[in-house]
């Protein structure tokens, strides 16, 4: 059966990667508990490539930034929709009472999308 993948490309300040990792660790726990098949968060390492459009240019990274490439794997698009609805309303994903939550990256610069897998393991 074909799988479904949510993909993310997230420009982020290098000094905020640690805070993002904490958030992503919680996200992984929640998405996996609700039925995701796999969950990856990957931070840029070899971004100066000679082929194609390097992530540095694609994301217009500043000198103090890197990029996170992340993806979550689901059994199907229907499963993805069900799991996302549960995960996004999970109480652990909600801001603590009386505390304002600020994302560790610029929400206007990140990219996301859903993808039908046509080759997978």
PLM feature spans:
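Residue-level signal for secondary-structure boundary sites
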Residues: 18, 78-80, 120
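Generic detector of contiguous secondary-structure segments
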Residues: 19-32, 67-73
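Short amphipathic alpha-helices in soluble, non-transmembrane regions
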Residues: 21-27, 83-90
């Amino acid at each position: 059966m074909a799988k479904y993948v949510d993909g993310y490309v997230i420009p982020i300040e290098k000094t905020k990667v640690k805070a993002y990792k904490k958030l992503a660790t919680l996200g992984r726990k929640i998405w996996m508990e609700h039925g995701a098949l796999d969950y990856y968060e990957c931070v840029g390492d070899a971004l100066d490539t000679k082929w194609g459009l390097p992530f540095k240019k694609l994301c217009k990274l500043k000198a103090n930034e890197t990029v996170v490439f992340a993806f979550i794997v689901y059994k199907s698009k229907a499963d993805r929709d069900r799991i996302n609805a549960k995960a996004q309303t999970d109480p652990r994903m909600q801001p603590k009472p009386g505390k304002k939550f600020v994302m560790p990256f610029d929400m206007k610069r990140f990219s996301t999308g859903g993808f039908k897998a046509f080759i997978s393991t």
